[in-house]
UniProtKB/Swiss-Prot annotation:
NCBIfam families in alphabetical order: PRK00596.1 (NF001861), rpsJ_bact (TIGR01049)
Gene3D superfamilies noted in UniProt: Ribosomal protein S10 domain (3.30.70.600)
UniProt name for this protein: Small ribosomal subunit protein uS10
Annotated gene: rpsJ
Keyword Ribonucleoprotein: yes
Functional summary from the UniProt entry: Involved in the binding of tRNA to the ribosomes.
Keyword presence, Zinc: no
Species, as recorded: Pelobacter propionicus (strain DSM 2379 / NBRC 103807 / OttBd1)
Amino acid sequence: MQSQKIRIRLKAYDHKLLDVSVTEIVDTAKRTGARVAGPIPLPTVINKYCVLRGPHVDKKSRDQFEIRTHKRLIDILDPTQQTVDALMKLDLAAGVDVEIKL
């Protein structure tokens, strides 16, 4: 598995939960002897929704809601078999979406 790269992309609505998951992944990778590049913060996607307050008329009265999606990128360079096994066994929080590319 030499001269390979594992790219891990994490997404979450809560940035604190995301940072905890990132530190767990980085610590696990460093413990098994792999080099780690990152975490690299990617741009936060902000989705804004505008909703009418009242059920009938009065379009001037509105509420605005937003959802922020935070993203991080981690590159694991020269992973060993122990690194891959440790990452597979790692239990991350439920609110974090993980995408892995080899």
